[in-house]
Amino acid sequence: MKIWIDSHYGTWRGLVRALLARAELAVGRLRPFALHQPESVRRAVFVCHGNICRSAFAHHEALRYGLNVASLGLSTSTGGRSPAPALASAARAGLDLGSHRATSWPDFKVQSGDLFLVMEVRQAHEIRRRLGNRDDVQVCLLGMWCKPVMPHLHDPYTLGDPYFDRCFERVRQAVRNLSADLPNARIADTQERLGRKAV
């Protein structure tokens, strides 16, 4: 049982948080973090704790779909690198995170049309708190684009390779499904809009 939990949810705590998130979803408490205006999204911003594992992988995976992307960590230092287990897991998935550098919240500039995609319910609440009354951005749970939905994507940092790989598989699936829902967040579309404004 422990091996199964560790490979699917990271730890017992990961399992408990996943179950609690599903319970919140079932009673409608996560409705504020649904994507309500996909056509208004101009950039996908992936968010996790340190911006060196989950959001780093999501960032580089989203680039493969031509999305206009950014990423940040809620508790990190700008310039931090992904740890060796994250680099190895990403490499097994065909992604190179060697060039990735973390960005902290103070060093991040929010833009109108940003869609913040967090990994955990508590992160969704924290991002919304930091954004204040801004109504030109949205906050969603990335795991809602998993099949089945995973409102809690537990942090793989310091955990074993099996869960690292499982977590990144879920992030990859979510990003793939998400990319189909963001018609106006493509890099080419963004560049074209900027070009029209400059004329």
Segments the model singles out, each with a brief description of its role:
Residues Q123-A124:
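Alpha-helix capping/helix-boundary segments
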